Curated annotation (Swiss-Prot):
PROSITE patterns: PUA (PS50890). It is found in: Cytoplasm. It catalyses: cytidine(1962) in 23S rRNA + S-adenosyl-L-methionine = 5-methylcytidine(1962) in 23S rRNA + S-adenosyl-L-homocysteine + H(+). This is Ribosomal RNA large subunit methyltransferase I. Belongs to the methyltransferase superfamily. RlmI family. The gene is rlmI.
Amino acid sequence: MTVSIYLAKGRDKALRRRHPWIFSRGIDRIDGKAELGETVEIYANNGEWLARGAFSPQSQIRARVWTFDKNEAIDKDFFVRKLNQAQALRDVLAERDGLTGYRLIAAESDGLPGITIDRYQDYFVCQLLSAGAEATKDLLVEALVECYPDCNIYERSDVSVRKKEGLKQRTGVLHGEEPPESVVIEENGVKISVDIVNGHKTGFYLDQRDSRERACKYVKDKSVLNCFSYTGGFGLYALKGGAKHVINADVSQLALDTAKYNAEINKFDLSKAEFLNADVFKLLREYRDNGTKFDVVIMDPPKFAESKNQLTGACRGYKDINMLAMQILNPGGTLLTYSCSGLMDAGLFQKIVADAALDAHRTVQFIERFEQAADHPLDSAYPEGFYLKGFACRVV
């Protein structure tokens, strides 16, 4: 028997605007008992059919919409269509930017709620973040194999958000071969080694590709401090852009070793690069206290806010770190600063940077805005898909 969800009166407006989430508080009743991730029918309170989605009994997001087409079944062909639609956009980007690594599926923004797929050469790395994504995993793998016959599929569902969906963390091969320690991709003429099994996220921060390329114009003949460098993404582009000297700072020696390897495979001048194992907050204070200055500081920290109750603390963290960055910049220097916290909108982040300038006793001019790369699209009905924001700031 098909399970049916009936929304409370007046709670169908977002769904009619094609927002893909149904919250528990918006449900009037459920007819039938749905299993974790089961496909259910969704109706307005008056019985009008609205959508078909995946049920998640433990999450505040009680259902995520697969389709608004009553005649569309959630089967292998459904996933094949979604993959082909997504690939059409990425083909344009891959040709334009010379990409062999990109985000193929950006979850809700590509019509597949809770499913993220990053492609590194012929390795497809899946993160399944919702009950529906987990329940349809076999169909997804079948669809990937049909669309990409030579693919290798690896799961990196080792993220804490799965607990909210009643799911355990999982990693491992879903199809084909285990990824090697290093898969080298290329973007904008830069080679990057990716560790799919042990790296952050699915191995690399693909969403910052456009920002990395745009950073090049600020660094020629400049001294650059690349904070939270991970495997050196921004630092590599700084060397590409003609920086005089680049310090890559991170707490992970493994990431720094990979950053150095990345510089080597790009044949950059290693005499212009440093790879410093350090706590960035402590390092910035040391530089401030001993008078060390830079022409450019790149500030790309990890997410500071995972939930709303962490937002206040995150604001303090972002303000402190940007204040310290401004204090070690030469007059007229450039701060490239970013936030990947989806709970913090661009307006709030800009205010935080402005407040940091006041505390640093510096004047800041916002001269450029950044956002996530084009393979992380924003669906018009799903504003939550916008999460990465950044600014180029002239600090005087």
